[in-house]
Amino acid sequence: MRHRVAHRKFSRTSAHRISMLLNLSISLIKHERITTTLPKAKELRPYVEKLITIGKVYREKNLVYGKRLLISKLKNIDATDKLIDVLSVRYKSRNGGYTRIMKNGFRKGDCAPIAIIELVDRQIVSQS
């Protein structure tokens, strides 16, 4: 039975796992779309959505505490600024569901399932 199993461990120590989620979340916030394995994407989704919700709540109230809280969680000022200035405005009327996970086949080397995780309602830039 899976009772009281909170999250995946990924065969890593807790510090390594937290660092991995932190790096993935910073990349997702900066680039708005990343490719990773499916279990990592599924584990990343609630982590990033909570950060976006924190940014939305504290932007509406215009509190410095929210920015400091996000800086302490993300440890990256550029990602924090983008989250507060761009993403919280974009998702002002959306109550959750800020990310989308799309399956993208399997990796060639070890046949691991690959997924694309992206922020919804993002601006698509043409490469012409």
Curated annotation (Swiss-Prot):
Asked if the record carries the keyword Ribosomal protein, the reply is yes
| Keywords from the UniProt entry | Ribonucleoprotein, Ribosomal protein
Q: Name one GO biological process term.
A: translation
* Pfam families associated with the record: Ribosomal_L17
Q: Does the keyword Ribosomal protein apply?
A: yes
> What SUPFAM superfamilies is this protein classified in?
Prokaryotic ribosomal protein L17
Please, which domain of life does this record's source organism belong to?
Bacteria
A single GO molecular-function term is: structural constituent of ribosome
A GO cellular component term found in this entry reads: cytosolic large ribosomal subunit
Family as reported in the entry's similarity comment: Belongs to the bacterial ribosomal protein bL17 family.
State how it assembles: Part of the 50S ribosomal subunit. Contacts protein L32.
What HAMAP family would the database entry show? Ribosomal_bL17
Its protein name is Large ribosomal subunit protein bL17
The organism's taxonomy opens as: Bacteria, Pseudomonadati, Pseudomonadota, Alphaproteobacteria, Rickettsiales
